């Protein structure tokens, strides 16, 4: 593969091992409202990279009782539950090693379906925030993954044409998003052994 013009990394499940923490936060919020069994682990991983509000919209389509709640408030509750768990986050060394290898040689960014402040906190706690020139969070875009907008915005902010970008990603929605943006994708699940929730 020729040297890319830029590298864009997903955050959760790619750079940092946060997926089990997100799963726990989802269940803390859902269990508190009596929805213990509506979000099994396989469905959770299928939504990797999708903003929390979009996940709740999907869950509400399939569980009528959830529609009685303010989904924006539930989104906030989930994010607060996750934020309380962030101090225990660790990095995924195989992928962080790749970021360190390219640091200072190629512009790099993080493109996440999570809130930017939470993404920054995860990167700060793991000591890798300074590797990245740009961080895109869910609040920066109108359409999250699998729409191409998040990765296109990352490329734009780095000043690199999308077709010259390579994306490191672990989730199906991220793969779809990156391919739709015209970018090459590295499936990091082949490199790492993720902790199951």
Question: What are these model-derived regions, one by one?
Answer:
Residues 1-42, 180-181, 195:
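Active-site neighborhood of HAD-like aspartate-dependent phosphohydrolases
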Residues 1-5, 96-97, 115-197:
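Asp-based, Mg2+/Mn2+-dependent phosphohydrolase catalytic module
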Residues 21, 50-51, 77, 90-94, ...:
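Short beta->alpha linker loops
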Residues 28-57, 61-62:
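N-terminal polybasic phosphate/anion-binding patch
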Residues 35-37, 65-66, 128, 159-160:
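Helix N-cap/coil-helix junction residues
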Residues 48-84:
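A metal-dependent, Asp-based hydrolase signature
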Residues 83-110, 116:
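Short, acidic loop-to-helix structural element flanking the phosphoryl-transfer center
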């Amino acid at each position: 593969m020729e040297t890319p013009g830029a590298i864009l990394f997903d955050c959760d499940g790619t750079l940092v091992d946060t997926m089990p923490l997100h799963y726990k936060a989802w269940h803390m919020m859902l269990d508190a409202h009596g929805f213990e069994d509506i979000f099994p682990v396989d469905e959770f991983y299928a939504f990797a990279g999708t903003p929390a509000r979009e996940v709740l919209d999907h869950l509400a389509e399939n569980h009528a009782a959830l529609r009685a709640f303010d989904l924006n408030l539930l989104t906030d509750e989930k994010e607060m539950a996750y934020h309380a768990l962030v101090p225990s986050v660790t990095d995924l060394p195989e992928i962080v090693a790749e970021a360190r290898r390219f640091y200072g040689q190629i512009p790099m960014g993080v493109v996440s379906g999570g809130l930017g402040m939470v993404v920054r906190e995860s990167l700060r706690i793991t000591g890798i925030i300074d590797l990245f020139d740009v961080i895109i969070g869910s609040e920066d875009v109108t359409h999250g993954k699998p729409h191409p907008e998040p990765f296109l915005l990352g490329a734009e902010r780095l000043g690199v044409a999308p077709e010259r970008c390579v994306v490191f990603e672990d989730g199906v929605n991220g793969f779809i998003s990156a391919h739709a943006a015209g970018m090459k994708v590295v499936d990091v699940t082949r490199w790492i052994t993720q902790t199951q929730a």
